[in-house]
């Protein structure tokens, strides 16, 4: 397809190149350009996006994927709108909560896709992940203030990882990967971290949502569970959030002091939410009545 204009989009952590392209009929599209080494993973991602789109999920629907020389080009519908993270606070708390409920409903649809791949049981797989992150954290020259609380909690609560189901995951599900369209609807974007795992692990990045909008984060949980949140969810959510934050400091190290400070601040906030892990439901969680 020939395009009359091509504007680079410089956002996100992906090493893919992203563009807003326009054809000769002034129709806009989203173009993602990847190295040809990623062809197989990009084909899988494209296939998964087609399946998600077929469920009626609001998103940049996939149109085509092809190898162009040394590059993989995947073309998607364009959404006119703004990043949810930048616009969510311009609407009422009730509307923030409603957007969160919709995000939870979308996630439940994504998790309904049938999984045919064989996968190792979740408990041994995730325990290795915890061990690896704790090891790297202990080797890290920088530490969190009171970081040992995270490690002690993880080691004392691994039993909850038993017998967990596994589903297809979006892989990076938080407020930074949503857009609010000009039609005021919410759209999910950035499917390039698709994975398999415990459906509830998908909430491990809800920290980013809660820091921006507790109403959105709370709505996401209520929407996913249709207002019936099981006790086990809170136990596992704490494990998944803490595993992430323990692994975040060694990850941030190469990016420098600014990124390290972001993670140290997040670790401090997590301890405040959980009162040094003495309570299991984070303090930002608002049920439907208090969100309104």
Predicted features along the sequence, with ranges:
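Short beta-strand segments
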Residues: 30-33, 63, 168-171, 188-190, ...
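ATP-binding pocket architecture of kinase catalytic cores
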Residues: 8-121
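An alpha-helical support segment within catalytic cores of ATP-dependent transferases
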Residues: 1, 112-171, 222, 263-277, ...
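Active-site acidic catalytic loop and adjacent metal/ATP-binding pocket
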Residues: 17-22, 154-203
């Amino acid at each position: 397809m020939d395009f009359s204009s091509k504007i680079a989009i410089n956002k996100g952590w992906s090493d893919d190149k992203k563009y807003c392209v326009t054809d000769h009929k002034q129709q806009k599209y989203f173009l993602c350009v990847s190295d040809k080494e990623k062809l197989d993973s990009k084909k899988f991602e494209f296939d998964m996006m087609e399946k998600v789109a077929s469920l009626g999920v609001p998103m940049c629907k996939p149109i085509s994927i092809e190898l162009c020389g040394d590059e993989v080009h995947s073309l998607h519908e364009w959404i006119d709108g703004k990043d949810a993270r930048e616009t969510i606070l311009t609407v009422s708390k009730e509307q923030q909560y409603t957007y969160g409920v919709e995000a939870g409903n979308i996630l439940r649809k994504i998790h309904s896709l049938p999984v045919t791949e064989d996968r190792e049981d979740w408990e041994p797989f995730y325990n290795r992940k915890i061990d690896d992150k704790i090891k790297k954290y202990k080797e890290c020259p920088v530490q969190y203030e009171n970081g040992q609380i995270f490690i002690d909690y993880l080691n004392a609560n691994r039993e909850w990882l038993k017998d967990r189901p596994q589903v297809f995951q979006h892989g990076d599900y938080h407020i930074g990967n949503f857009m609010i369209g000009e039609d005021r609807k919410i759209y999910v974007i950035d499917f390039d971290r698709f994975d398999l795992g415990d459906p509830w692990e998908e909430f491990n990045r809800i920290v980013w949502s809660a820091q921006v909008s507790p109403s959105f984060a709370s709505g996401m949980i209520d929407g996913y569970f249709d207002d019936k949140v099981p006790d086990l969810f809170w136990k596992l959510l704490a494990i998944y959030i803490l595993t992430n934050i323990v692994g975040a400091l060694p990850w941030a190290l190469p990016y420098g002091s600014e990124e390290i400070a972001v993670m140290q601040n997040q670790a401090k906030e997590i301890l405040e939410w959980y009162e040094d892990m003495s309570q299991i439901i984070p303090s930002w969680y608002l049920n439907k009545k208090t969100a309104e």
